[in-house]
Curated annotation (Swiss-Prot):
Record's signal peptide: none
Family (UniProt): Belongs to the glycosyltransferase 4 family. MraY subfamily.
Example of a GO cellular component annotation carried by this entry: plasma membrane
Pathway this chain belongs to: Cell wall biogenesis; peptidoglycan biosynthesis
Record protein name field: Phospho-N-acetylmuramoyl-pentapeptide-transferase
Record's catalysed reaction(s): UDP-N-acetyl-alpha-D-muramoyl-L-alanyl-gamma-D-glutamyl-meso-2,6-diaminopimeloyl-D-alanyl-D-alanine + di-trans,octa-cis-undecaprenyl phosphate = di-trans,octa-cis-undecaprenyl diphospho-N-acetyl-alpha-D-muramoyl-L-alanyl-D-glutamyl-meso-2,6-diaminopimeloyl-D-alanyl-D-alanine + UMP
Amino acid sequence: MLYDLLGGMAGDIQALNVFRYITFRTGGATVTALLISFLFGPRIIALLKAKQRRGQPIREDGPQTHIIQKQGTPTMGGFLILVGLVPSVLLWADWSNRYVWIVLFVTLGFGAVGFADDYLKVSKISPKGVPGRVKLFFEFVIALIAMWALVLVSSEPLQTALTVPFFKTLLIELGGFFFLFGALVIVGSSNAVNLTDGLDGLAIVPVMIAAASLGLIVYLVGNAVFADYLQIHFVPGTGELAVFCGALIGAGLGFLWYNAPPAMVFMGDTGSLALGGALGAIAVAAKHELVLAIIGGLFVLEAVSVIVQVASFKLTGKRVFRMAPLHHHFEQKGWAEPTVVVRFWIISVVLAMAGLATLKLR
């Protein structure tokens, strides 16, 4: 909005030229989202607490300490993140950029699926919400619509091609399979973040780290000069997604203020599915789907731990981990919750640095 209102006046008022800069608007979106989520946080949390009464149902088969320590904490805190994120993006982003609208569509669509899941859990006072197959169906519908839109706005030769890290010019043409591949990235990213969201502050910081990394990537791939210098594929228009990433970080920081141990509110599926879907959509738009697996490696580890645990138990009757997802395994080994959280944050930073290194190591 401000880009259109004030950027167009830059010819008459030189100072307004800053609204044309993606970096300035990214910073503005970050601060705006932080202030909104921070200031409205207490009211939203109080409302959630009043409506939910007993708070988020705690898994009886999970760590027993959670039943005692986390009982009564409200969920759906992702709504607080979205309240900070969406207005900030609309205020600071270029409304004519179609990538921004596509990622917003994915974010709100997955957020709606998560909200339905959280609502059923709270209303039924049960950890079981929307059936898994139903949830996946709607997630894939949203993701496939987004993929159709992303292919429409992309240009040849990148429309349905997969770029490979460490290789300058290598493109793997996927054709029609690219729609399914991209949808898998978006849905997989969404559910991987969802599985990671099991301890106070555990998911939101790695999400912000991934958003910061992707924000830098979209800024570089969306700039012809930087893309040519780094010898990465130039994707026109994706630079505007840096504003979205900035807003996500700001909203995440505001949420973390209330989600830090001991949490006053849980993110819930409303937040985890929305944020994970957003990260996946941004990676697909920037043609860095495989790099997302490195940057978001912590989410991959959490998801794989669940897959391995379930497969092993069904095939052999034995469990590989003491409990899945992975963070619960370390809790069962005797690690304190803050220890697990901070160490997983460190892993996220290291993996993000490794992912960003692929921009130069070619």
